[in-house]
Amino acid sequence: MNINTSPDQIIRSSAQVTPGYMSGFGNSFETEALPGALPIGRNSPQRCAYGLYAEQLSGSPFTAPRGTNERSWLYRIRPSVKHSGRFEKADAGLWRSAPCHEYDLPIAQMRWDPTPVPKEEVTFVQGVQTMTTAGDVNTQAGMAAHVYLITKSMVDQHFYNADGELMFVLQQGNLRLVTEFGRIDAEPGEIVVIPRGVKFRVEIPNGPARGYLCENYGGAFTLPERGPIGANCLANARDFLTPVANYEDKDTPTELFVKWGGSLFKTTLPHSPIDVVAWHGNYAPYKYDLRTFSPVGAIGFDHPDPSIFTVLTSPSETAGTANIDFVIFPERWMVADNTFRPPWYHMNIMSEFMGLIYGVYDAKPQGFVPGGMSLHNCMLPHGPDRDAFEHASNGELKPVKLTGTMAFMFETRYPQRVTAHAANASTLQDDYADCWKGLEKRFDPNRP
């Protein structure tokens, strides 16, 4: 190339045009569904190929530091101003946003059985049920923990969330998320993250689906620092998958739902908004298989802090204090010598919302089942139940592999307030605290 060569004259192989995914976390990706749809050497040419419109989607302020600056350039059939109309308020159902003070419940440790999947037809937008909220959606701080129940695919319906990014934690049933950036297929054991402002619809290819949904009002999820662990283990960047471009050119009416300022709005469009033919950038949806997480732990003695199981973190303005940590408890070996191996008894400045995707959780072998949930708020004590304590205190300390298990936690610096729905749910275990009743006084000053 000489100094007179324009970027459009550069010969190169086209960006990825085959169906599938691109590997990596936070990469600057590029992909096109039609050869040559992606401009070379510039973002906003005078005329885009194929008559497309160039549009930037910013996930951070323009002046954010390079390491946290997120944006993507989309080359679409219509600009997003054509994916808008006269909005009207829509029924949000059981979807709530922080601050939510609709129920004043005495402080307590709480646990719920799985929420039954309804028999009636329910789409994703209709099927979100909020369990807890924390922080304030209007200050972009905090989170909400939801359950989603889906028995019907969204057909000629789309949605985007202006209040935060969404993390789907699949528990039962597969999902297909058709997004502006491409298509994501996921199964239980995987998570999908949809950034703030990205349009999508949810389909269920194999029947009803249930799972957990974290709505992150704060900074985008990112990989945690590994510190002395080094360059490997935990969630490795190469295992995150971002979809390749895949567009629709459909001139059929569709409803667009938007969550904004804690409320739900809707409008009708004459066409599908899934019309991005090519894109490049680092602000995009992705999925991750939790079974590829490489855990680290104690190989001598003692039980390390659960932060070593952090998959993703949403940082706050205070170093080391997360807006949200997404933590999992996967299959792993327990080998510590002369050690109480389950999670220890604990009072925590952070607030913990837990769920179980499959298997048995070692600290609660009874009562905490797949699809269930628990809440241990700021400075409320929690820990193993009596059976877990007795087994761990008296069992033979040989190496044990915990298999077929996957629990998770949404941990936040903000107290989590339960919604009226969660407080009055028939699945709430009124006797949850009884799991610790059998813990007897064992103190004997005459027996060291």
Swiss-Prot record:
Residues where homogentisate binds: Y361, H382
Keyword list, A-Z: Dioxygenase, Iron, Metal-binding, Oxidoreductase, Phenylalanine catabolism, Tyrosine catabolism
Binding residues for Fe cation: H346, E352, H382
Enzyme class: oxidoreductase
Coiled coil regions, renumbered to chain: none
GO biological-process terms attached to the record: L-phenylalanine catabolic process; tyrosine catabolic process
Top-level lineage group: Bacteria
Enzyme Commission numbers on file: 1.13.11.5
Matches recorded under SUPFAM superfamilies: RmlC-like cupins
Keyword Oxidoreductase included in the entry's annotation: yes
Function: Involved in the catabolism of homogentisate (2,5-dihydroxyphenylacetate or 2,5-OH-PhAc), a central intermediate in the degradation of phenylalanine and tyrosine. Catalyzes the oxidative ring cleavage of the aromatic ring of homogentisate to yield maleylacetoacetate.
Protein's recorded name: Homogentisate 1,2-dioxygenase
Gene encoding the protein: hmgA
